């Protein structure tokens, strides 16, 4: 029995891809495979001011290490700040021992004679520890007002910080990491039509409600007036084998885009891996358990679109009759008959080694008369 041959490629984010505005330009993909933006923002006027105006979003987007550092520094800073204020109150009222108060003197805050004592009183008051060793007397109405102000301000601060922590934890970002796109898109015939296909799977048992997959074709475009648009965006529609607009994503599904005369992909040289474009895929849905909107993104470059392949079936039945989704087969593709009706352009920019190797594999498959599985992985 002939063994199945597999070929692995290493694909990094920094690639020698086709130029946007001319030959010889190195560029990175606009969107990484895991959905992160590769766009760098520069020369934004008053950027810091704009971020400070929207503190809520700024704190939520902040990385955890900076958030924890800011959280600790904020509490320690307020304890010390109000500790200094309590110390100044004690100085103004003559409560310090070095000021030699009279024997019948009643301090504003009992047992606060040093800056350290004032700091401890501030900490105990703000955290509502209340050891009882240091306490406010009725001698100073100003001290009572100061205590109320400290508790109100720090409570508001605690609510804000706690809210940003909870909002960051509750974001559906981690839920999006359990939605998986296939590493490659494939082009083959489906129901007698040439189709570009991608595979999507939900790796949790909880469902996504109202799933929709949309695509954006990013490429250089020249208008009739001669204007060059560096990243022109064109909608690419995807569908599944169902009449519903919201697929039931309980098992891995294959989404199809029919490459016909109305398709924005019809003039692209998909077979040769040639061209300067990027296909961005976006899956949107509602998380069943939290009702939060979740969005997952990925992108495909020309060399990540395989011509004349289809996905290996990844769903099977166990001996007990249960459905099994085998994710070891999720990214595997198998050679099939090439679809007809699509452009077959001469290779100009394709990776010569890759194309030569794939051609030799096709010839080997024809000689052996067996299906050839080619898997190209990103690392």
From Swiss-Prot:
GO cellular component: astrocyte projection; basolateral plasma membrane; cell body; ciliary base; monoatomic ion channel complex; plasma membrane; presynapse
Intramembrane parts of the chain: 115-131
Record-annotated membrane-spanning stretches: 62-88, 141-166
Ranges facing Extracellular side: 89-114, 132-140
Matches recorded under InterPro entries: Ig_E-set, IRK_C, K_chnl_inward-rec_Kir, K_chnl_inward-rec_Kir1.2, K_chnl_inward-rec_Kir_cyto, Kir_TM
Tissue expression remark: Expressed in kidney (at protein level). In the nephron, expressed in the distal convoluted tubule, the connecting tubule, the collecting duct and cortical thick ascending limbs.
Cystine pairs: 108-140
Site (Role in the control of polyamine-mediated channel gating and in the blocking by intracellular magnesium): 158
Reactions performed catalytically: K(+)(in) = K(+)(out)
Binding residue positions for 1,2-dioctanoyl-sn-glycero-3-phospho-(1D-myo-inositol-4,5-bisphosphate): 36, 168, 171, 173
Keywords: ATP-binding, Cell membrane, Deafness, Disease variant, Disulfide bond, Epilepsy, Intellectual disability, Ion channel, Ion transport, Membrane, Nucleotide-binding, Potassium, Potassium transport, Transmembrane, Transmembrane helix, Transport, Voltage-gated channel
UniProt-annotated location(s): Membrane; Basolateral cell membrane
Motif (Selectivity filter): 128-133
Molecular-function annotations in GO: ATP binding; ATP-activated inward rectifier potassium channel activity; inward rectifier potassium channel activity
Activity regulation comment: Channel activity is strongly regulated by variations of cytosolic pH; channels are activated by alkaline and inhibited by acidic pH values. Inhibited by Ba(2+) and Cs(+). Activated by phosphatidylinositol 4,5 biphosphate (PtdIns(4,5)P2).
Major subcellular site: membrane
Protein's GO biological process: adult walking behavior; cellular response to potassium ion; central nervous system myelination; glutamate reuptake; non-motile cilium assembly; potassium ion homeostasis; potassium ion import across plasma membrane; potassium ion transmembrane transport
Membrane topology (Cytoplasmic): 1-61, 167-379
Membrane topology type: Multi-pass membrane protein
Xref: PANTHER family: ATP-SENSITIVE INWARD RECTIFIER POTASSIUM CHANNEL 10, INWARD RECTIFIER POTASSIUM CHANNEL
Subunit structure, interactors included: Homotetramer. In kidney cells, it forms heteromeric channels with Kir5.1/KCNJ16; this interaction is required for KCNJ16 localization to the basolateral membrane. Interacts with MAGI1, alone and possibly as a heteromer with KCNJ16; this interaction may facilitate KCNJ10/KCNJ16 potassium channel expression at the basolateral membrane in kidney cells. Interacts with PATJ.
Similarity annotation: Belongs to the inward rectifier-type potassium channel (TC 1.A.2.1) family. KCNJ10 subfamily.
Function field: May be responsible for potassium buffering action of glial cells in the brain. Inward rectifier potassium channels are characterized by a greater tendency to allow potassium to flow into the cell rather than out of it. Their voltage dependence is regulated by the concentration of extracellular potassium; as external potassium is raised, the voltage range of the channel opening shifts to more positive voltages. The inward rectification is mainly due to the blockage of outward current by internal magnesium. Can be blocked by extracellular barium and cesium.
Disease: Seizures, sensorineural deafness, ataxia, impaired intellectual development, and electrolyte imbalance: A complex disorder characterized by generalized seizures with onset in infancy, delayed psychomotor development, ataxia, sensorineural hearing loss, hypokalemia, metabolic alkalosis, and hypomagnesemia.
Protein name per Swiss-Prot or TrEMBL: ATP-sensitive inward rectifier potassium channel 10
Organism from which the protein derives: Homo sapiens
Primary gene name: KCNJ10
